[in-house]
Amino acid sequence: MKLLKYPRQLHDGQLLAGCVVGGLLVVVGRDRISAYDCGKLQAAARGELAVREVSAEVELQVEVGEDALRYVAGGEGELVVAGDRQIWAAGADWRSAGRGTRFLTVAQLAGGACVTDVKADGAGLVFVSVSGKDEVWLYATGAWERVGVVTLAAKPVTLVVDPLGELLTVVLQNRSVAVYQYNRQGAVRMHQQLPQYVQTNPLRYSITMSPQGDLLPLVNSIKNGLPSAQLLDRTAGFSVQSTLVGYVDKCKILRFSPRLYEKPNKDKPPTQYNLLASSGNEDGSVIVWNTKRTKPLLNAAKVTDTFINDVQWSRDGTGLFAISNDGYLFIFAFHEVELGRLLDDAELEKLRQSVPRLEPLPPPTPKSLAKSEAKPQQDTKPDAKSSANSVSAKTGKKKIAPTVITSTSMEFNEPSYTVPKDLKRRPKQETQTNGTTTKRPKRDVEPMDFLDTNLLIPNISFSKARLATPKVRMNFQYCNTLQQNLVMEVKNGTGSEQKPTSITLTLKDKEKDMVLFQDFTPRFVTICTCGHSFWACCTEEGIVYVYSNTGKKLLPPMIMGVPVSFLEGCGDYLLCVTSMGQLFCWNVKEGKLKFPVNTIYPLLNPSIRYSDDVLTRAENITMCTTTENGIPLVTLSNGDGYMFDPDMEIWLLINDSWWAYGSQYWDFTNTSHAGSSAAAGNDKEDKKNKYWNADAEYLIEEVKKNKKSVVNYLESKTNDEMTRKGLIRNLQRFAKTILMKEGFENLEDIVTLSHLENRLLVALKLNETNEFTKLLKVYCISLAEMGFKNRLDDVLSWLYNDGEYKVGTIANEKREELLKQILVACADIRQVQRVTTSYASALGLLDVSL
């Protein structure tokens, strides 16, 4: 290895960043850009070329005003430089044009916004992270149009680009690390929130991924109280593959070589490995690591009296360039025998092909392109155990990491299982049996020491129902579904008076955002919601605040006494479910309860899951909300959906996953085609056309178009749960086997009618009158075609009302009109004409219809 310090000080002693474009090393500082031939620099370091013969191939100057060039990135077709407030770009001809190169101003920031990093993926996209706005902008080279925006939860510090062109990693100022998936059209979504945390000093990092795209380095990761660099394996869910300990204190640079290396072994296959360079230490050292070893391959200690601003590898992987803060360039020239055999591009491409690719993102909608905003969406579950990691202090004592999380998605704390140690439990009486039975023990309560048993809330520790509660997020936003420009933003403080939590309602506008109101509380806020004329939020302790759109308190703070698991608003109603399963539904406008306090405990199948042990696990609650009329709705992970009837004060079953197996009319929305008639293969048309009726088909299409139908939505959620559990195949087997068994020939008809009857009753309870009338006609047509004469007569008799059919209404429609429509729809079905004829004669329709 040869080391050369370029003798001339560059850019008046201010070199801030560099990048390698083709065979040129591009460095920037002040208002100047210089490009040097990497081959000549390495030849000069080896003594093959006189140093005085090495000079800049290209010298450029940019009109920066009071700004200074701090970032540079580029590819074969572009060169991008940026300062704190401006971004400039040049085309592919900048090398030949020289001083005649024209720089286009891509963006100019104002106010408190500032550029924190610029990266190019080499395939037509440039990423710019902007603080103040807390965003990452995606630009398409050539036209330099902004094609996408990533909205972040905190100030972005560093960007890491995936060489495979799929992932963008963002290091945030709050020490968290987020990974996003992107495509060339600018569509972006959250891929994973990493459990690792980084130090915030130094703030700016220079990080690259491995050339094969499977390793992501994180510098200054906290582990056992010591700074370390962790290499995360992309193919294993970004778990830690190896750790570099030592020589990384206050490190801010970790750059992989663009080539892959191989070391031959005598008795074993050759070992393939990456090389990466780290620097940024206060002593100005440059360290080269072999990813297969725990010790550095090269430790060039104190090559400069100041610190290193940037490190770049040559394209051939044999040269390393370091830029010092005092404006000097250091060239490291290696021989192949020192680093190992260089693998060719074909072998590197083979390794890239072995990395699993992600499912392609859908193209961004025109609406999102107009707003130039791509909101991150989480498609993988964050590691729930990451918040429980313990950190060892210097004293050797373990301290628990804070539960405050930075993810914009909601995570939950598990229910508490702790009780005081002085609590004694009655021993179980063991029954003597001849045989030995093995029973899987349930999770028992965990005793722990308390300073005072009064600190423990008995009603939580011994509650029959315990729900998970949301974790505290550092900041999050909640948008009104009806008015997307109304956004409530919560920025949690420290949970004390020194730094209270800020609650802000903002009206987003294209020209200017307007703050409608702001409030402060010395507590952590976990959930937000809104109705037609109110906004509500709850704290970690279970205190609910209700505001008007102008910030006026509509109700005094309501004390739940325990943490809140669900808080949902709709219309004038606010629904609250505590961690003990207590259900509250308030009419905010009138300031009173819709119905007495109830519980969701009956929905968790307590009789089925009852045991002598203390704790049993129930189905997860996937949704808990309310309608505009104040009717609570709940769905479970098994696919069942429920509603609470305020009049009867009991829970009612809306949709049973069993109906998906046999009902012909399951899932009118056809979201997943889960009905048995839709899963029966080649016999689908025969089964569906068995009782085909044009009037019924038309009515079904009308119901299908109703996007506001509660039952349609709940049935689609049932299908989602069944798809998630892989039960869709069972539907196909059901349609082919059980319907052919003896004694089950009419099972499909019975399940279909049961499903329709329940939908009718639920629609009537939910006051969905239009859907009720259509379903009633479909139900009567089905009864007529299946030959259920007595049941059809029962329905017609209910409508006839002992001859008082001209008095009163059903679902806002006159009984007489509804009865006439049903009789006309069933008039052509011969097997029920005796039933329909008698009612048609009573209504005076017989002569007209005949």
UniProtKB/Swiss-Prot annotation:
Keywords per UniProt: Chromatin regulator, Nucleus, Repeat, Repressor, Transcription, Transcription regulation, WD repeat
Statement: the UniProt record of this protein carries the keyword Repeat: yes
GO molecular function, one term: DNA binding
GO biological process terms held by the UniProt record: chromatin remodeling; negative regulation of chromatin organization; negative regulation of transcription by RNA polymerase II; negative regulation of transcription by RNA polymerase III; nucleosome assembly; transcription elongation-coupled chromatin remodeling
Keyword Transcription in record: yes
GO CC, any one term: HIR complex
PROSITE patterns: WD_REPEATS_1 (PS00678)
A Pfam family per the record: Hira
Record InterPro entries: HIR1-like (IPR031120), HIRA-like_C (IPR011494), WD40/YVTN_repeat-like_dom_sf (IPR015943), WD40_repeat_dom_sf (IPR036322)
Region feature (Disordered): 354-398, 411-444
Segments of skewed composition (Basic and acidic residues): 370-384
Protein localization: Nucleus
Segments annotated as WD repeats: 5-46, 61-98, 110-149, 151-190, 255-299, 303-342, 519-557, 558-596
Function: Required for replication-independent chromatin assembly and for the periodic repression of histone gene transcription during the cell cycle.
Family from the record: Belongs to the WD repeat HIR1 family.
Protein name: Protein HIR2
